[in-house]
Every structure is written in structure tokens, then in C-alpha cells.
């Protein structure tokens, strides 16, 4: 039976709408983790498809400066994986939450314990950017009988056969990495990016979402045209931290019609 995240995103796709997933850093709020529910409900009210929630880590190799600094602010607020899990148990939302974490915090907590503790929460997906596909067996057995999907990341340098290998049996969505580099580095897209995304979209049987560097209205239009939707991180994190208006951008993204 398909996992909840797969079903919800497939329903949005079937309705002819673009999927929009904002990223937020857990604990990057003046109230620390006590402000997480407020941020989630703010985004839920704007109609987002799902919400990616980052766990702060001191060595975030895939993150650009905006998200790295957000992680440091969160850690300064005392955020820990244990505290985040306890907070997530208290949050009620109809929007699927997708946890983005490096493997180290997960390993320190214990993968089995992490999955068990989140079983009755809104968490429906897990992204581990520094976990190679060959080591997915460190995590997958613990997710097999749960409603949490392990989300594969597919980079621009991935050939077609490797793409098929990475996405075989995947649930939730495929995270298509739009740039070779860290998050938030916009505008430096390869000339063959659209071709790469179209090819990935053709071989995938679950939604393909484009992330890393997506930050403008033009990006929304471009990537919704060649994939099923977008993930936006740095732009959202920066706006929330600085109190900048972000509602109109999110509303435009949510309202995108294929």
C-alpha cells in the first residue's frame, strides 16, 4: 500500500497543480522549538503541499550559508534531536512533514528509536543527504512497516541507469538536485538541466521535485514545467528569519497550474 506522502503528492499532481514544498529549520525561531508549530501552521494555512523540516547539524556539507547560519541559530537556542522529536509529537497538522537530517544526528539518536518515536506524528518522509544509496540499508529496514518514506536524491551527474537504480521502489517523491553544489546557490544551472529533469520525470513513477537554488518566480515556472514541483529552502528560511514578506511568493507557488 502506498505511503501517505506518495498518495497526497500524487493527488496534487493528478489535479494538474504544481507541488510546492518549503524548507524550514527546526528551532530557528525567536521561541526556539516552541515556535515550530506556529511556523508549520503558517505554511499550512497558505496551502503548501508538504513541509521539509531540517534538523540542525554542526557540519552541514550540503547546506549553503543561509541554511548553515539557521542551523547555528537553532543550536544556539538549544535544539537537539531529542527535543525536536518530543516537539513533533505535540504538533497537529494535516500537512505531511519531511525530516531533512544528516546521518550523524540520526545515528546518535538511534535509527530504530527515531522511527519508532515519530510513528504517530505528522512525519511522513525522511531525507538524508549524506547517506549514499549503497548504505540505505542502514535505514530502510526500520521504515519498511511504517508510513515514513525514504526520499532519494538524484544529482545532475547521474546517468539514466543509475537514476533507475536510485529510484526503484522509492516512495514519497524524487528529490532532483538542480545544481552541483550547496543549497541556496541560484542561477548557475547547467545548460542540459531541463533535459536531465525531463528524463528523470520520464522514468519515475512518483512525483519528481526540483530543489537546491530554486528562489524566483522564473524558477517556479521553469521547474514546474519539467518536473512535478519545487522545493524552496534558503529563500523561505531567510524571509522567516528577517521578517520579510513571503506569503505572495508561496501563494504563487501553491496556485501554479500545469
From Swiss-Prot:
Active site residues per record: 52 (proton acceptor), 63 (proton acceptor)
Pathway: Amino-acid biosynthesis; L-tryptophan biosynthesis; L-tryptophan from chorismate: step 5/5
UniProt GO MF annotations: tryptophan synthase activity
Keywords linked to the UniProt accession: Amino-acid biosynthesis, Aromatic amino acid biosynthesis, Lyase, Tryptophan biosynthesis
Identification of the protein by name: Tryptophan synthase alpha chain
Membrane-spanning ranges: none
The gene coding this protein: trpA
Cellular component, GO, one term: cytosol
NCBIfam families with a match to the protein in the record: trpA
Family that this chain belongs to: Belongs to the TrpA family.
Described purpose of this protein according to its UniProt entry: The alpha subunit is responsible for the aldol cleavage of indoleglycerol phosphate to indole and glyceraldehyde 3-phosphate.
Organism, scientific name: Streptococcus pneumoniae (strain Hungary19A-6)
Enzyme class: lyase
Reaction catalyzed: (1S,2R)-1-C-(indol-3-yl)glycerol 3-phosphate + L-serine = D-glyceraldehyde 3-phosphate + L-tryptophan + H2O
Alphabetized SUPFAM superfamilies for the sequence: Ribulose-phoshate binding barrel (SSF51366)
EC number(s) reported in the record: 4.2.1.20
Subunit organization: Tetramer of two alpha and two beta chains.
